[in-house]
C-alpha cells in the first residue's frame, strides 16, 4: 500500500490526500476474543461465551449445525458455542476418566482430549489422548464408541481392526474425502490410517523411531519427528506439522512421497516473514488450510499464529508478539497469546484459534 501512496507524488511534492486515502483503506489482520475471560474455570456455562470461563481450549471446529465446537484439555470436556454466542458443555465431567463404549454423551468422561473433527455422516470424533484412543459420538450425539485404540499405550495391530490396535498418545485426527481417518500417533512417531469401510488400521508414514525426514523421498522407511497435526487440502494432499522436527510437510498419498514445505528444523522464534524452508519454528501444534490453499500453523511455543503461502513459498507471522500473554482485541500482531493449539479455517476466511493458556477462543480476520 506504501507504493500506491507514492503515486501521489508529482514533481517532488507528496500528495497528502493520496496518502490519507491509502492509509484509511489499508486492510490488515485483526484479532478478537469470542469466548473466555482469560481465567481458567467453568463458571458462566450456559451463558454468553465472552463472559464464560474456559480451561485450556485445544481443538476447535465449526460443526455442521453452524456452531463452534471445541475440546478443553484442562477440564476434559467437549463444549459448544451456538449462533447466539451461548456456550454449553456437551460432554465431559471436569475430571479425567475413561468411559466404556455405549455411555450416554452427557455422562462421558475423557482424559486430556486434544482434538475434535466431524465426519461426513455428522458424527463427532474425539482424540482422547491420555486414553490412547479415538472416540466417536453417534450421529444423534447420543452414545460413545471407540474407533481406534485399545486404551493401552503401545504400538500394535497394523493390518487388523483399529479397535484392537494400540496407539501411543494420539494428538490429531483428520478425514479424507472418502471418510478414512488419519491419526497422528505421536508417541510412536507415526501417521496411521483407519479404513472407512473395513475399520482396518495401517501405518502410512514414519518408522516408529524419531528422526529427520528425507525431503522428496518415499514414505517407506522415512522417519518422522513428532507428527503432531494434520489437515487435507483441496487436492487431497495431507499436510503434517512435526512438533519436535519444527517443520511442515506435504504428503502426496497417491505417490507415497513426502515433501518439506516450511521449517529449517531449527527451533526458534519465527521472523515476521521469511523464506519458508529457512524459517524457524517452535513446536507447531495446529494445522489448518484455508480456501486459498494457505497453510496456517499454531506455533505453540512461540505463542504465534503463522501462515505458509505456497505461491510465494514464505512463512509470515500473522498473530502474536512472540511473548506469552493475554493480549487485547485489535491488530493481530500486537496481541500476545499463550501457547495456542487448535486452529480452524472458517468459510468466511477467518481463522479460529484455541488460545490455550490464555483460556480464550479467538478469531483472526482481515479488514
Segments from the language model and where they lie:
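Blade-level signature of beta-propeller repeat domains, shared across WD40, Kelch, NHL, RCC1
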Residues: 339-367
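Gly/Pro-rich loop segments of beta-rich domains
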Residues: 24-56, 86-112, 141-169, 198-226, ...
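Short loop/turn segments that connect beta-strands within beta-propeller blades
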Residues: 81-86, 138-142, 195-199, 252-256, ...
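Short loop/turn segments immediately following the C-termini of beta-strands
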Residues: 73, 129, 186, 243, ...
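Conserved beta-propeller blade signature
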Residues: 67-69, 123-125, 180-182, 237-239, ...
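Structural signal for beta-propeller blades
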Residues: 76-78, 132-134, 189-191, 246-248, ...
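Residue-level detector of Asp-centered blade-edge/turn motifs that repeat once per structural unit
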Residues: 62-65, 118-121, 175-178, 232-235, ...
Amino acid at each position: 500500500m506504501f507504493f500506491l501512496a507514492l503515486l501521489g507524488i508529482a514533481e517532488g511534492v507528496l500528495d497528502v490526500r493520496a496518502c490519507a486515502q491509502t492509509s484509511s483503506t489499508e486492510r490488515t489482520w485483526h484479532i478478537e476474543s469470542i469466548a473466555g475471560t482469560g481465567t481458567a474455570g467453568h463458571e458462566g456455562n450456559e451463558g454468553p461465551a465472552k463472559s464464560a470461563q474456559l480451561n485450556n481450549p485445544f481443538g476447535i471446529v465449526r460443526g455442521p449445525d453452524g456452531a463452534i465446537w471445541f475440546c478443553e484439555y484442562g477440564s476434559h470436556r467437549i463444549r459448544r458455542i451456538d449462533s447466539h454466542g451461548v456456550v454449553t458443555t456437551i460432554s465431559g465431567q471436569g475430571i479425567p476418566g475413561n468411559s466404556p463404549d455405549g455411555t450416554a454423551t452427557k455422562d462421558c468422561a475423557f482424559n486430556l482430549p486434544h482434538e475434535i473433527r466431524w465426519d461426513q455422516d455428522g458424527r463427532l470424533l474425539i482424540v482422547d489422548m491420555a486414553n490412547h484412543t479415538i472416540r466417536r459420538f453417534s450421529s444423534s450425539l447420543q452414545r460413545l464408541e471407540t474407533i481406534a485404540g485399545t486404551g493401552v499405550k503401545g504400538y500394535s495391530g497394523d493390518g487388523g481392526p483399529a479397535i484392537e490396535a494400540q496407539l501411543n498418545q494420539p494428538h490429531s485426527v483428520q478425514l479424507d474425502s472418502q471418510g478414512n481417518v488419519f491419526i497422528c500417533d505421536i508417541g510412536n512417531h507415526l501417521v496411521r490410517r483407519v479404513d472407512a469401510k473395513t475399520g482396518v488400521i495401517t501405518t502410512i508414514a514414519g518408522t516408529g523411531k524419531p528422526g529427520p525426514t528425507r525431503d522428496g523421498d518415499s514414505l517407506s522407511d522415512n522417519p518422522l519427528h513428532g507428527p503432531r497435526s494434520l489437515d487435507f487440502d483441496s487436492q487431497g494432499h495431507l499436510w503434517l506439522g512435526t512438533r519436535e522436527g519444527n517443520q511442515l510437510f506435504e504428503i502426496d498419498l497417491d505417490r507415497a512421497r513426502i515433501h518439506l514445505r516450511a521449517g529449517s528444523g531449527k527451533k526458534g522464534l519465527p521472523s515476521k516473514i521469511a523464506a519458508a524452508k529457512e524459517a524457524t519454528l517452535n513446536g507447531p501444534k495446529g494445522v489448518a488450510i484455508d480456501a486459498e490453499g494457505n497453510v496456517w500453523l499454531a506455533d505453540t511455543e512461540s505463542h504465534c499464529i503463522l501462515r505458509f503461502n505456497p505461491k510465494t513459498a514464505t512463512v509470515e507471522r500473522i498473530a502474536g508478539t512472540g511473548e506469552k500473554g493475554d493480549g487485547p482485541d485489535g491488530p493481530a500482531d500486537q496481541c500476545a497469546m499463550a501457547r495456542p493449539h487448535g486452529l480452524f479455517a472458517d468459510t468466511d476466511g477467518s481463522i479460529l484459534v484455541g488460545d490455550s493458556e490464555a483460556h480464550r477462543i479467538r478469531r483472526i480476520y482481515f479488514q
